[in-house]
């Protein structure tokens, strides 16, 4: 009889253990052993950094450096210093937005227990109504009924204001949107940094735009020339003015839009998906309280410890039946018998070839080791013959109980198991070292 050894506890440093980020089922990309979590489109982050750093570098070299001599004392140096510090601050906010957990809800290993029956309650005598999870549940929030949906991927009911991101393949709390420019979902834990990043980028564009015009004005005053001629003397300023003007429309418009969302306590997803007014939005707490909730509330800790150790899932060992060993294909056939489905005999060919000839019909698909087991009893032979004469198509029947929550063997399988046990007791002296495996299908 093959006995599966009990699982052994392993230390955190054993080779059989992995960290959570190594077994993560989402589409996220991790850096520094799970300390930074990014979205699958993290490469776009490099483009965003270049769009910020390159214009500021051009500004410091060709514009701000020449303004140092035009301002007395330390005012000229401060122009360069402010631009550099502002850029570093902006990039830090970008990293805080892109490299942290946005509020991912850990997915369940198994679906929750079904609570209602789905299907016809007046099922036949040999059938049991199937248990199925309801797709939508209703919850109350501030006196308003919300419908929460079941997520098949994460196997959980998404709480209010939570949505599943198809890009990151995660359910995110207070999901706002997935931003390709930062390569990350925007949710409960990084929305504050996202808005600060967009707002600071807008201010940086205004800063560069303004001092480029200051430099052009200085050229006009020193050389007593027109605006167009002064602009031709500093092509870098012309490029930066055009670039920052276009950028201000994008990031500035995004800043104004999110100021509206914060004042009404909405998310981008809710604004496009639903239409709240001031009376029907259950999340609106007033302009002042909405801003306090966004910028001065405590950021909840992450629900995921990406650096925690998890044990590697061991492979399933072969199971034993009546003193012998059973291959995985044979186990699959037995599982299908227990579930009321037709056994897939074709998949058992390799396992049966070691014990007998696979060319015979279903009546002779019995595993006998070295011919030590005697002829089968008439009862078992009649049962096998009866099953083999049935047509190939059978309705699938589930033995899942209505309330028990467990799989039970059908009476036909129990009766057959009892007959096999009696046969083994009668022939135990001559077949102690052999294994008998017989396959049957419930009627």
Curated annotation (Swiss-Prot):
EC category name: transferase
Keywords: Acyltransferase, Cell membrane, Lipoprotein, Membrane, Palmitate, Phosphoprotein, Transferase, Transmembrane, Transmembrane helix
Residue numbers carrying Phosphoserine: 327, 377, 406
Disordered: region residues: 382-443
Domain DHHC: 149-199
Biased composition (Basic and acidic residues): 382-392
Gene Ontology terms for molecular function: protein-cysteine S-palmitoyltransferase activity
Function (record text): Palmitoyl acyltransferase.
Domain notes: The DHHC domain is required for palmitoyltransferase activity.
Protein name: Probable protein S-acyltransferase 7
Natural source organism: Arabidopsis thaliana (Mouse-ear cress)
């Amino acid at each position: 009889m093959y006995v599966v050894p009990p699982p052994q506890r392993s230390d955190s440093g054993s080779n059989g253990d992995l960290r959570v980020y190594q077994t993560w089922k989402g589409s996220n990309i991790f850096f520094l052993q799970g300390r930074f979590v990014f979205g699958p489109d993290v490469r776009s982050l490099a483009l965003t950094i270049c769009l910020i750093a390159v214009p500021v570098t051009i500004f410091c070299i060709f514009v701000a450096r020449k303004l140092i001599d035009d301002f007395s004392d330390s005012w000229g140096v401060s122009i360069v210093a402010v631009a550099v510090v502002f850029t570093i601050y902006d990039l830090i906010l970008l990293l805080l937005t892109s490299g942290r957990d946005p509020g991912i809800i850990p997915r369940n290993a198994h679906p929750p227990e079904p609570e209602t029956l789905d299907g016809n309650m007046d099922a036949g005598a040999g059938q049991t109504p199937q248990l199925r999870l309801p797709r939508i549940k209703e919850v109350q929030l501030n006196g308003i009924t919300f419908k929460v949906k079941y997520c098949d991927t994460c196997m959980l009911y998404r709480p209010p204001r939570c949505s599943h991101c198809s890009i990151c393949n995660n359910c995110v709390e207070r999901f706002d949107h997935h931003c390709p420019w930062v390569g990350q979902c925007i949710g409960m834990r990084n929305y504050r940094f996202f808005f600060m990043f967009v707002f600071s980028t807008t201010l940086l564009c205004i800063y560069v735009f303004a001092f480029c015009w200051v430099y052009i004005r200085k050229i006009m005053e020193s050389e007593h020339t027109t605006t167009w001629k002064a602009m031709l003397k500093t092509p870098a300023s012309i490029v930066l003015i055009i670039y920052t003007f276009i950028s201000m429309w994008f990031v500035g418009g995004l800043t104004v839009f999110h100021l509206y969302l914060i004042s009404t306590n909405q998310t981008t997803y809710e604004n496009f998906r639903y239409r709240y007014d001031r009376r029907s939005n259950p999340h609106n707490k007033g302009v002042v309280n909405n801003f306090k909730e966004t910028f001065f509330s405590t950021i909840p800790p992450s629900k995921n410890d990406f650096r925690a150790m998890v044990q590697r899932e061991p492979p399933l060992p072969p199971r034993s039946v009546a003193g012998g060993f059973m291959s995985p294909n044979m186990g699959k056939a037995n599982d299908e018998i227990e579930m009321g489905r037709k056994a897939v005999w074709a998949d058992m060919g390799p396992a049966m070839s070691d014990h007998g000839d696979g060319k015979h019909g279903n009546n002779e698909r019995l595993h006998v080791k070295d011919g030590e087991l005697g002829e089968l009893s008439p009862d078992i032979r009649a049962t096998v013959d009866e099953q083999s004469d049935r047509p190939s198509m059978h309705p699938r029947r589930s033995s899942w109980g209505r309330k028990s929550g467990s799989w039970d063997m059908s009476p036909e399988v129990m009766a057959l198991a009892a007959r096999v046990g009696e046969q083994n007791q009668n022939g135990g002296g001559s077949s102690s070292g052999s294994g008998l495996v017989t396959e049957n299908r419930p009627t």
